[in-house]
Amino acid sequence: MSDYKSTLNLPETEFPMRGNLANREPEMLKSWNENGLYQQIRESRKDAKPFILHDGPPYANGDIHIGHSVNKILKDIIIKSKTMSGFDAPYIPGWDCHGLPIELKVEQKVGKPGHKVTAAEFRQKCREYAAKQVDGQREDFIRLGVFADWQNPYLTMDFSTEANIVRSLSKVIENGHLHKGVKPVHWCTDCGSALAEAEVEYEDKMSPAIDVAFTAVDKSALLAKFGLADYAHNISMVIWTTTPWTLPANRALAVAANVEYTLVEMVKDGQTQALVLATDLYESCIERFGAESHTVLGTVAGSDLELLRFNHPFYDFDVPVILGDHVTVDSGTGVVHTAPGHGQDDFVVGQKYGLEVANPVGDNGVYKPDTEIFAGLHVFKANKNVVELLEEKGALLSHVQIKHSYPHCWRHKTPIIFRATPQWFISMDQKGLRTQAISEIEQTKWIPDWGQSRIEKMVENRPDWCISRQRTWGVPITLFVHRETEELHPDSVSLMERVAARIEQQGIQAWWDLDASELLGDEADQYRKVTDTLDVWYDSGSTFSTVVAARPEFHGHDIDLYLEGSDQHRGWFMSSLMISTAMNGKAPYKQVLTHGFTVDGQGRKMSKSVGNVISPQHVTNKLGADILRLWVAATDYSGEMTVSDQILNRSADAYRRIRNTARFLLANINGFDPVSDMVAIEDMVALDRWVVRRAAALQQELLEAYDEYNFHLVTQKLMQFCSVELGSFYLDIIKDRQYTAKGDSNARRSCQSALYLISEAMVRWIAPILSFTADEIWKLLPGERGEYVFTETWYEGLKSITLESDLSDEYWDQLLAVRAEVNKVIENARREKQIGGSLEAEVTLFADDALSAVLEKLGDELRFVLLTSKTEVVALAAAPSDAIGTELASLKLSLKKSEAEKCERCWHHREDVGTVTEHPTLCVRCVTNIEGDGEVRQFA
């Protein structure tokens, strides 16, 4: 054989079989960075139509997790595929840099502001900490192969962004959406200040647990709801609470709309009265009240009780029944005492019903002087007085001491309270923001489409947005309010622009360093500076204006797409919608796409305690970023995204199939010159024309899938093409022609031309997903080309030509089916040691007339399609009884081992082996390919 080896066209490539991605990818990243790849891409799309994907900023604290990776990789796939589609798609990554988590980290190192460090020093430390966190996360994102302007990201703590946040707020104010109100916050009476969620610890505490009766104002209206006409005794609704001191601030009774309530008559100490209680709880309540007997009078849904009124147990006013989602029937009575000034749920539901936010308690935890009955008492001491008063009024149904978990101050270790304090709000209704926002939601495309109804419901039901915080590290609310009237300065908008100009130069510290007289002159004594900072959701929610509208890369274009996890309907999508509508009267985005959360193989949330966390760093170090990227692309992100080592190993297997296909393509177009060796599609062998046609059709499908962000469809169709049309059919068939045909014959060049066209197309198809591998392939493709595939557009060389004399796609589909049946028979014969390989087989196909016509079209070339040395087509009626049946009703088969000699060069068993005396071990076909003009192939 050694004499003839040099006459074969053996495959050869530098593209290694093993990806070795974990080691090779970092070298590529270095090269991309040194060559300014991102800038090259920007340059290549200079005047193209823009596509703007705006990056929702992750929080600058801690390492990135798998959810961050999913998010950034999805964005990167979109940016790259849009670039391939000819768009100018800049990607400016961002980070959210202000807020409590960073403050807490810095406090652990330097203590609280105002103690060992000044507030100014503390802010500087926060800035330094956030910058360091950004650096760490940036490296991890770059490692994923995400293309972005990494050296010029946006940070919400950039001086320019901080200034623009102030400008954004001034526009919201100018449009009339700001108002001052009150909101309950955690309050430590020892500190005399509000506490953030993170400053609250839960400890066990003994508290009075009481059941209190509120008597009906209009008994007949209540009875009518239960279908009753008359009742002689008192009727009350009963609440259960462990904070009797909040009863002076009670302004409503909350029930659950979809819970059933029972009117139950109770006799106790000879007294009869009827009580409204949740059906699921009334028996335990009656027992707790010590009833001697009871009778059920009727039942009704909670929703039917809405807006009925009941008397306050010790003040001279009545309160309504309201519906609240927070009401449960786990314990108590199923009716919740509602004091909007003393509870977050109470406040939210109270906003919906326009309830007064009563706050009778001062900073020090003592009732204010105008509090009826309890003025001057500390709230915790007043519990006893409230209980005694209820007993005196006959409103106390039960009273016990219970031990329960209660919020405490982390500094003083003392119980805290919820207390309404003055805050700044963006109003949902005073200028029609709610209505406008809902209208904008309808103009936006939501992917998946259930996102629309989800955010619509949230906007319909949300309270005013409290945008103020009492923190140190945040963008200040740069307002001056009148010391006596609390009114905003009439020139607030222009004053805010002057403050913004200073912040642009010096950062947010400029506000705290500012003396009011510098801007207000003689008026300074009448006004005070607001010391509150903005909710960090305002920082990120305003970036459509503070970043996208401000940065030159975006050329002032509208944003096409926001893409984040499904929790952001409540978060970034919401805050962005509110601010943009308040500022500009429109949504900031045209499309909003959400992806699900990552869960482990059993559908559980990732958790260190469970030990099921998969870190992106672990995956890139072990398998490589392209494997992680392939997993992201192949997973349907519209639901939960399941990840585990086993699932990632499956992605690695899928990757190997794609890599092996690419390797075969490269190895067989080695030395091919696309200028001089290319065979026109109309001159190709029919099978080659078919595969080019299939590739062209596939490209259309892939481009549509990319355009609709259906990346799992892209990977599915690509895998199908690599495994079935190419792997199991086309590539298998052409090996003989590719290796044994005359080197520059039409038979071989036709095949190479098809492989070249597929390679040019496929490297582009995979580039948005398998970026590292695409770059590796690109550098080994023959012909002149640009430095990077990423500056290219989708391949236009694929033509879908069907000649009149051609075999249709349906024809080849039939052949695929026949070949699959023949393969089964050959495999079986190999297993039973009847033959060694398929070329030892001679196959007879017993086919009906229709199928015979199909098979006979190929003449002697049918054997190349079936990978056998000899193939014969015979009428189905002539099939012997021992012929092998197939899944095709029109086909039976028989197989025998060839008795012909094996050609030393092509390994086919042919009767003409040795008939050319100069080449006694070769078949005539091989002699023609070595010494003659080369064999002619028409079909395969």
Curated annotation (Swiss-Prot):
Q: What EC numbers are recorded for this enzyme? A: 6.1.1.5
Motif 'KMSKS' region extends across 605-609
Q: How is the cofactor bound?
A: Binds 1 zinc ion per subunit.
Entry keyword set: Aminoacyl-tRNA synthetase, ATP-binding, Cytoplasm, Ligase, Metal-binding, Nucleotide-binding, Protein biosynthesis, Zinc
Q: Which annotated residues bind L-isoleucyl-5'-AMP?
A: 564
Q: Which cofactor does it need?
A: Zn(2+)
Instruction: Supply one GO molecular-function term.
Output: zinc ion binding
A biological process from GO: isoleucyl-tRNA aminoacylation
What range does the record give for the signal peptide?
none
Q: Which residues bind ATP?
A: 608
Where is the protein found, in the record's own terms? Cytoplasm
* Entry binding sites for Zn(2+): 903, 906, 923, 926
Asked if the keyword DNA-binding belongs to this entry, the reply reads no
What are the GO cellular component annotations?
A: cytosol
Catalysed reactions, as listed in the record? tRNA(Ile) + L-isoleucine + ATP = L-isoleucyl-tRNA(Ile) + AMP + diphosphate
Motif 'HIGH' region mapped to chain? 58-68
Q: What does this protein do?
A: Catalyzes the attachment of isoleucine to tRNA(Ile). As IleRS can inadvertently accommodate and process structurally similar amino acids such as valine, to avoid such errors it has two additional distinct tRNA(Ile)-dependent editing activities. One activity is designated as 'pretransfer' editing and involves the hydrolysis of activated Val-AMP. The other activity is designated 'posttransfer' editing and involves deacylation of mischarged Val-tRNA(Ile).
Q: What is known of its domains?
A: IleRS has two distinct active sites: one for aminoacylation and one for editing. The misactivated valine is translocated from the active site to the editing site, which sterically excludes the correctly activated isoleucine. The single editing site contains two valyl binding pockets, one specific for each substrate (Val-AMP or Val-tRNA(Ile)).
Complexes and interactors? Monomer.
Protein family membership: Belongs to the class-I aminoacyl-tRNA synthetase family. IleS type 1 subfamily.
Question: What is the name of the protein in this document?
Answer: Isoleucine--tRNA ligase
Gene source species: Shewanella halifaxensis (strain HAW-EB4)
